[in-house]
Swiss-Prot record:
Record field: transmembrane: none
Pfam families the record matches: MraZ
Species annotation: Nocardioides sp. (strain ATCC BAA-499 / JS614)
Keywords: Cytoplasm, DNA-binding, Repeat, Transcription, Transcription regulation
Name of the protein in question: Transcriptional regulator MraZ
Gene Ontology biological-process entries: negative regulation of DNA-templated transcription initiation
Subunit organization: Forms oligomers.
Record's keyword annotation contains DNA-binding: yes
Length: 144
């Protein structure tokens, strides 16, 4: 199952977030929340996170960018699980990193979920939409 769509659930006062019902089955075996690029959070099913971890570890640590990526990915990671109500707990340091308050935007990005502050999402999305509109000659996922 892929994660698709945009949702606007709310964080409660304890940092718990209801995830869309259609996302929950894929996370039943566990999840990992990490810092993402552009100051969002990434929610990975545990098995997908482990694949990402293997890729990160396969890159020689003599490559500075690989070291930086691994440090950010693993140091900020928080293992978790859905509670009986379908919520995940987002640790305070992760909420602070992403500037999350009560209002959040949750987006499905195929194999992972991203959680955004609404203002940051609108700013990022506006720029990304403009770039997307310019991709009429070559799909973004292909190389030169």
């Amino acid at each position: 199952m892929n994660f698709l769509g945009t949702y606007t659930p709310k964080l409660d006062e304890k940092g718990r977030l209801f995830l869309p019902a259609k996302f929950r089955d894929r996370l039943a075996e566990g999840l990992v929340v990490t810092q993402g690029q552009e100051n969002c959070l990434v929610v990975w099913p545990t098995d997908v996170f482990m694949e990402e971890a293997r890729r990160a570890q396969a890159t020689p640590m003599t490559v500075r960018g690989a070291r930086d990526y691994a440090r950010v990915l693993f140091a900020g990671a928080d293992e978790g699980a859905l509670d009986k109500q379908g919520r995940i707990n987002i640790a305070a340091p992760l909420r602070e990193y992403a500037a999350l308050d009560r209002e959040v935007v949750v987006i499905g990005v195929m194999d992972r979920i991203e959680i955004w502050d609404p203002v940051r999402w609108r700013e990022y999305s506006a720029g990304a939409q403009a770039k997307f509109a310019e991709l009429d000659e070559q799909p973004a996922h292909t190389s030169g």
